[in-house]
Amino acid sequence: MESKIYFLNKISLFSVCGLMAGSIAPVLAATKSVPTVAGKKVIGLQIYSLGKELTENVPAGMKKIKEIGYSTIELAGYGNRKMGQYEVSEYRKIVEDAGLKITSAHVNPPERKYTSENTTKISDWWKQTVEDHVKLGVGRLIQPGMPTIENHDDVKLVCEVFNNAGEITKAAGMKWGYHNHNMEFKRIAKPGETLPTGPGAILRPTGDVVYDLMVDGTNPDLVFFEMDVYWTVMGQMDPLDYLEKYPKRIQVLHIKDRSVLGQSGMMNFENIFKKAYTNGISEFYVELEKVKANMTQFEGVKGCFDYLNTAAFVK
């Protein structure tokens, strides 16, 4: 039987190349599920999943999130020192009145290209952002956007900026982290090296993986990582490999699939959760970007909750 690592890597290759079809799904072993009482498990939601369906009526939307069964939320949408149309303290009250707890937030600095000339500007932005998120009661600030990285010098500067953001955040009693997509798993050439190109280049990996350089180049006391397991697979990597390689640095997960959790057949969530629990990871957030036709985002996030709430492998 194929190892879980080889299997996940093969599935991700099919997915990226656009070759994956429904016939692949039966290859996955059936996951045993047992019914549980809704809301007994602590399941978090990244509110980006809901888009306008939430922002059009935040108070009603937050209550709906709670009714579905979610316990915690991870914020998105901070800008100009506000959460959408709301002052941060007002937004926090809306969330808490709905019976939810804000435990994390995604925020991106205004600069994507880091230079020696704009690092002070970025640092000042983090200082005011931290101040606002203290008012929101957030325990973690997470950057989900990858800065421009083309070479090792770029990585070095990015890591310095990340460490600085971590220092600012730590001083306020919070933690600072980074969230990946697929781009972080690209490779950059080592000095004197040329990366392979053309057909089959992906089968001849060389160079350094940006994600690894980020983890290895940042201070463990200042920077943690929130792994998006779906985007890791889409980056041609196996989440299990990284959970094994960086058991202390990866502290939070984004649980995501191509659409509603468990429907694509391409994500081995059972093994991912088992390894996460072994590593001591207990917090995760559902993220849903796309739903099928004739389904609302709220219906989609409910489907995700139901999948996790009835899965025997989720504590």
Task: Identify what each model region corresponds to.
Residues 50-56, 76-87, 109-123, 147-156, ...:
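Acidic-and-aromatic substrate-binding clefts and catalytic sites of carbohydrate-active enzymes
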Residues 87-96, 129-134, 163-167, 240-245, ...:
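Short amphipathic alpha-helices and their capping/turn segments at secondary-structure boundaries
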Residues 100, 138-139, 174, 279-283:
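A short helix->loop->beta-strand "cap" motif at the edges of active sites that frequently abuts
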